[in-house]
From Swiss-Prot:
Residues in compartment: Extracellular: 20-236, 287-298, 486-496
Record's catalysed reaction(s): Ca(2+)(in) = Ca(2+)(out); K(+)(in) = K(+)(out); Na(+)(in) = Na(+)(out)
Positions annotated with a glycan in the UniProt record: 36, 93, 138, 166
Protein name per UniProt: Neuronal acetylcholine receptor subunit beta-4
Sites annotated Key residue that facilitates effective access of the conotoxin BuIA to the channel binding site: 82
Binding site for Na(+): 262
A GO molecular-function descriptor: acetylcholine receptor activity
Subcellular location: Synaptic cell membrane; Cell membrane
GO biological processes: acetylcholine receptor signaling pathway; chemical synaptic transmission; membrane depolarization; monoatomic ion transmembrane transport
Signal peptide region: 1-19
One Pfam family of this chain: Neur_chan_LBD
Gene: CHRNB4
Provenance organism: Bos taurus (Bovine)
Transmembrane intervals: 237-257, 266-286, 299-319, 465-485
Known function: Component of neuronal acetylcholine receptors (nAChRs) that function as pentameric, ligand-gated cation channels with high calcium permeability among other activities. nAChRs are excitatory neurotrasnmitter receptors formed by a collection of nAChR subunits known to mediate synaptic transmission in the nervous system and the neuromuscular junction. Each nAchR subunit confers differential attributes to channel properties, including activation, deactivation and desensitization kinetics, pH sensitivity, cation permeability, and binding to allosteric modulators.
Length: 496
């Protein structure tokens, strides 16, 4: 055992003789020399005089855009805030310490400018991890702490879901003002070298700006504008396209026949479906009264159109079920809706086929009835006009005056034939009056049915007119609502 002890000591001496051990000893000695309590106090600002400004260079690196909560108006990001300044007390001559030029020191042992996120939304102002600071031999200090920031973000819902937001991250020292430190931008924009793309937002620009207040010389801050644009595919698939399809169902209302009885049911069903979508939107966007979201405007627009279709359906049904006993068709209605509008609306009314005797037959029947009535009124001598050449009970010889007791060649008394012909004339007259009544009644029914068909045709023309109005207004309204947000431009806010 004693013989092995010299060998161990020799090995330790050999290892310490290597460069690594010398460097380790040099860094340890340098750490002790720099952070000696009699020489360095991490609570004191590294300034040679009380009037000297310590310049703090800031550079933001965006690692990930975690989320944007529209309802709570909070943006969550994963950032690295690079801070650089010069501390003359941490400078050394590298030749005296084995050529050591860089030294890593725990952040709690050196002075920090206590720069925090001013527009913090969760009350946690500390960084996620207090990493070491990197100190160089010339006294320059670099600190790159990672942080999960939850910042307040004013959400503009005007163009939702085709919106573009400008969320800001404002950094400022918590205890030092502009008379003690000066915050400057190392680069005009934030870095995205290590950025992980987001599935919901596109990064448009990340400009930074230094803000001072001329009226307050002690104020200075550095603000980064996160100009982000939403990827609308999710909301297009789940909100906009279903709304458009449901709205297009309202067009079918104008194609449903009025006798179907389902026009009002379809209209109200579409209206209820749009109301459900409106309730879904209210749970996504913030409850603000400053602006109405674009999708909300579209839903309200479609709800107005569907309500209009309900009103028009009521009017069309009212016109469709009119009859001559309740309404009289005005001449301007006939002229406008039966002759002029159908041509412009590409409607051609089919030619109506008469289902009963034509008007000329009815006229001949009426004329024959009048002739028969006159003949019967004139007596038996004119009955030949009714029966043509038939001489059943009247012959030409009866025209001459004879004795009332005379008999014909058959031996039948002539007064008996006259009495028989009088009873026959009465029966025929009653039969003809019945036929005339039936003919007039059928004619009246045909006229009433023709008027009813005219009212139904007017209802169809009105329905087609409202259909074209609905389609034109729906298309123009949809294009007018969704087209402007696609070409919107956004400029960073210049407010301090």
């Amino acid at each position: 055992m004693r013989s092995a002890l010299p060998l161990v000591l020799f090995s330790l001496v050999a290892l310490c003789g290597r460069g690594d051990c010398r460097v380790a000893n040099a860094e340890e000695k340098l750490m002790d020399d720099l952070l000696n309590k009699t020489r360095y106090n991490n609570l004191i600002r590294p300034a040679t005089s009380s009037s000297q400004l310590i310049s703090i260079q800031l550079q933001l690196s965006l690692a990930q855009l975690i989320s944007v909560n529209e309802r709570e108006q909070i943006m969550t990001t994963n950032i690295w805030l690079k801070q650089e300044w010069t501390d003359y007390r941490l400078a050394w001559n590298s030749s005296r310490y084995e050529g050591v030029n860089i030294l890593r020191i725990p952040a709690n042992r050196v002075w920090l400018p206590d720069i925090v996120l001013y527009n913090n939304a969760d009350g946690s102002y500390e960084v996620s991890l207090y990493t070491n600071v990197v100190v160089r031999s010339n006294g320059s200090v670099m600190w790159l702490p990672p942080a999960i920031c939850k910042s307040a973000c004013k959400i503009e819902v005007k163009h939702f879901p085709f919106d573009q937001q400008n969320c800001t991250l404002k950094f400022r020292s918590w205890t030092y003002d502009h008379t003690e430190i000066d915050m400057v931008l190392k680069m005009p924009t934030a870095s995205m070298d290590d950025f992980t793309p987001s599935g919901e937002w596109d990064i448009v620009a990340l400009p930074g700006r230094r803000t001072v207040n001329p009226q307050d010389p002690s104020y200075v801050d550095v603000t980064y504008d996160f100009i982000i644009k939403r990827k609308p595919l999710f909301y297009t698939i789940n909100l906009i396209i279903p709304c458009v399809l449901i709205t297009s169902l309202a067009i079918l209302v104008f194609y449903l026949p009025s006798d179907c009885g389902e026009k009002m049911t379809l209209c109200i069903s579409v209206l209820l479906a749009l109301t459900v979508f409106l309730l879904l939107i209210s749970k996504i966007v913030p409850p603000t009264s400053l602006n109405v979201p674009l999708i909300g405007k579209y839903l309200m627009f479609t709800m107005v159109l569907v309500t209009f279709s309900i009103v028009t359906s009521v009017c069309v049904l009212n016109v469709h079920h009119r009859s001559p006993s309740t309404h009289t068709m005005a001449p301007w209605v006939k002229r406008c809706f039966l002759h002029k509008l159908p041509t412009f609306l590409f409607i051609k009314r089919p030619r109506q086929q008469p289902s009963r005797a034509p008007q000329s037959s009815l006229a001949r029947l009426t004329k024959s009835e009048a002739t028969t009535t006159t003949t019967l009124a004139m007596g038996p001598t004119s009955s030949s006009n009714l029966y043509g050449n038939s001489m059943y009970f009247v012959n030409p010889g009866l025209a001459a005056p004879k004795s009332p007791v005379a008999s014909d060649s058959a031996g039948i008394p002539r007064d008996f034939r006259l009495r028989s012909s009088g009873r026959f004339r009465q029966d025929v007259q009653e039969a003809l009056e019945g036929v005339s009544f039936i003919a007039q009644h059928m004619k009246s029914d045909d006229l009433d049915q023709s008027v009813i068909e005219d009212w139904k045709y007017v209802a169809m023309v009105v329905d087609r007119l409202f259909l074209w109005v609905f389609v034109v207004v729906c298309v123009l309204g949809t294009v007018g609502l969704f087209l402007p947000p696609l070409f919107q431009t956004h400029t960073p806010s210049e407010e301090p």
